[in-house]
């Protein structure tokens, strides 16, 4: 994040810089080359494939242009098109040509400047991208490596599995609403272990009635479950007797719930495996285990934070982290009009959501952060609304994490409470 201002970015493009605009595709990429003033060196877009041979050919083309036009630096720019740019970006970085990214929205808005035409094609887009790079309208991507690369991948897998589990749970809930709505009066959670044991053998009310109280109880005894017995079995039987669930399509209904339960259990096993790996990776990062000592902060928060942020040493201060999360304060003012100050919501959305969730956890479980939240919402000067205060608590946690990770200090509850009395703490918040 160092030297990340627009002036610094513009100054990085000198007379000796070869600027590349690359239109990234799933299988084929197109590139055009320019100098720092926008004069093109490539007669036509250079086409190369998303393969090792294609990358080598692209590198040879770049080196030929560098030598021919006496350039000593290459700045390749591209749009972050899904995941398609990852391999090309890593190849360029490994060959000492650090890629930069331009905002796709900026590309879309800028492509009419030259010809007043919104046409999108493989020749036009690389030129627009290169133009944005020359103007310093780019961002320097962070490509994690080592333990941070593993942690980000594992964290992404965790989020995907949790999303799949949520979808499966919703489908199971739908199944109950259709075939056995009374089940939810017996079990508050559809995934209760004793309930799932019964569902595997007797999913429909008529199946449960066939088993009877003794049959239901025997299933639990065979599974060595002691927390449930005939009293719970009787409640389940009574619910089945008075069920208003649909009796049509019973054969398919049994198959559907069996498949859903199998999917649910398999995803849970995978999630546990991923969480084991995540815990091992977090332990490899210096001071990361200290973050877990903060009451209300768990392994999911720490791993998610480190996966999104990566190496903390690349940031100069906590404000850069705040900006990355989209929690930077932005003001909407003009002339005598002074608008509301809000958060930017520009940055890594998953990091922002994670911080918001942990802020709610901290306010509920951590005395120091609860006191901070109370101060924000009840102070005499400029009290914050609850949602605004949670954003301020999230920003405070960023500062705490940053100091602990960069300076190697332990969490200090007394200092945390002492910070509340500082007048500079969020006079205005999102």
Segments the model singles out, each with a brief description of its role:
Residues 1-430:
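A detector of single, family-specific signature residues
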């Amino acid at each position: 994040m160092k030297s990340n201002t627009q002036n610094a970015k513009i100054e990085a493009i000198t007379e000796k810089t070869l600027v590349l605009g690359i239109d990234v595709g799933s299988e084929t990429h197109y590139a055009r080359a320019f100098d720092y003033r926008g004069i093109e060196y490539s007669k036509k877009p250079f086409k190369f494939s998303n393969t090792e041979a294609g990358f080598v050919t692209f590198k040879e083309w770049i080196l030929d242009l560098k030598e021919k036009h006496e350039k000593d630096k290459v700045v390749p720019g591209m749009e972050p098109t899904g995941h398609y740019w990852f391999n090309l970006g890593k190849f360029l970085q490994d060959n000492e040509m650090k890629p930069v990214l331009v905002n796709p929205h900026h590309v879309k808005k800028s492509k009419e400047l030259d010809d007043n035409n919104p046409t999108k094609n493989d020749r036009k887009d690389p030129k627009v991208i290169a133009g944005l790079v020359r103007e310093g309208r780019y961002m320097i991507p962070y490509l994690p490596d080592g333990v941070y690369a593993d942690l980000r991948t594992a964290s992404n897998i965790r989020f995907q599995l949790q999303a799949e589990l949520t979808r499966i749970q919703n489908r199971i809930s739908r199944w109950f609403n259709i075939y056995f709505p009374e089940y939810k009066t017996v079990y508050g959670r559809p995934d209760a272990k004793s309930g799932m044991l019964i569902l595997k053998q007797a999913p429909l009310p008529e199946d449960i009635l066939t088993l009877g109280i003794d049959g239901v109880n025997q299933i639990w005894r065979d599974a060595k479950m002691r927390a449930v017995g005939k009293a719970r079995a009787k409640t389940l039987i009574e619910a089945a007797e008075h069920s208003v669930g649909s009796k049509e399509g019973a054969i398919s209904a049994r198959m559907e719930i069996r498949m859903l339960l199998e999917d649910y259990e398999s995803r849970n096993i995978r999630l546990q495996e991923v969480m084991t790996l995540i815990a091992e990776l977090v332990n490899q990062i210096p001071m990361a285990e200290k973050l877990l000592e903060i009451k209300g902060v768990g392994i999911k928060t720490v791993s998610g934070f480190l996966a999104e942020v990566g190496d903390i040493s690349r940031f100069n201060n906590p404000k850069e982290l705040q900006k990355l999360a989209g929690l930077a304060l932005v003001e909407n003012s003009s002339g005598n009009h002074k608008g509301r100050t809000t958060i930017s919501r520009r940055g890594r959305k998953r990091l922002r959501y994670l911080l918001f969730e942990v802020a709610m956890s901290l306010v509920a479980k951590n005395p120091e952060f609860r006191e901070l939240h109370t101060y924000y919402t009840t102070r005499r000067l400029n009290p914050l609304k609850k949602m605004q205060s949670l954003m301020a608590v999230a920003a405070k946690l960023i500062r705490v994490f940053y100091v602990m990770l960069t300076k190697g200090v332990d969490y200090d509850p007394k200092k945390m409470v002492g910070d509340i009395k500082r007048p500079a703490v969020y006079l205005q918040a999102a």
